[in-house]
């Protein structure tokens, strides 16, 4: 029963995480489209010149990188987008930390109940009754604190996370340019970076739930 409940709670959490990154993805897509839209006419003009043989492929790619990848506005865009993704990661970590104490509590209580149910009455009298009560929120949090070595809370190091996301956004843009993506496709590449963050959050949630489940059971002994 505790396994089934834990899995159900994990599915609920994963849905919440999906909503977080879906919203972030929409916002990033809008920012990227607005940014690239400002250069659409210039892009069309330069692309036509490139097609006419006035530029080599490397020269055209260099122009694109100067426009999109290295300019001040491009840097500001990536900084803004990276911070938005880091904000989503912080929200995801908070959701995970909010749920794991309850997973600890239920698995702790269920394990304690199972231990008691398997003990002979004589042994229970010798060692004292094992109380089976649902742990309230405050007790659960205290239990989590005591078990931090087993189950440390999820934390997002903001500056490190922002740097990581900026690098991934830059790489996505570079790959798009090298592969000759249209402006629309360039904007869409940023969604892949959102997907990376979403995947990492799901992985963190599953790891945290497994740790909470095991930690709760161990605490019953």
Task: Show the residue positions of the predicted features.
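Acidic, glycine-rich two-metal-ion catalytic cores of nucleic acid-processing enzymes
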Residues: 192-221
């Amino acid at each position: 029963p505790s396994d089934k409940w834990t899995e159900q709670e994990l599915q609920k959490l994963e849905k919440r995480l999906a909503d977080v990154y879906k919203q972030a993805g929409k916002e990033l897509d809008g920012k990227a489209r607005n940014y690239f839209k400002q250069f659409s006419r210039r892009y069309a003009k330069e692309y036509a010149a490139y097609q006419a043989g006035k530029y080599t492929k490397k020269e055209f790619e260099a122009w694109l990188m100067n426009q999109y990848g290295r300019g001040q506005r491009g840097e500001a865009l990536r900084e803004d987008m990276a911070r938005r993704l880091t904000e989503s990661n912080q929200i995801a970590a908070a959701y995970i930390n909010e749920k794991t104490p309850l997973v600890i509590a239920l698995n702790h209580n269920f394990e304690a109940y199972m231990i008691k149910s398997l003990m002979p009455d004589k042994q229970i009298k010798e060692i004292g009754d094992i109380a089976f009560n649902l742990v309230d929120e405050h007790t659960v949090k205290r239990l989590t604190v005591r078990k931090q070595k087993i189950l440390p809370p999820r934390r997002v190091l903001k500056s490190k996370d922002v740097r990581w996301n900026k690098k991934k956004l830059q790489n996505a843009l570079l790959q798009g340019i090298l592969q000759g993506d249209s402006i629309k496709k360039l904007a869409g590449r940023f969604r892949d970076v959102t997907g990376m963050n979403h995947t990492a959050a799901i992985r963190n949630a599953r790891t945290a739930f497994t740790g909470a489940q095991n930690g709760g059971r161990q605490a019953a002994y």
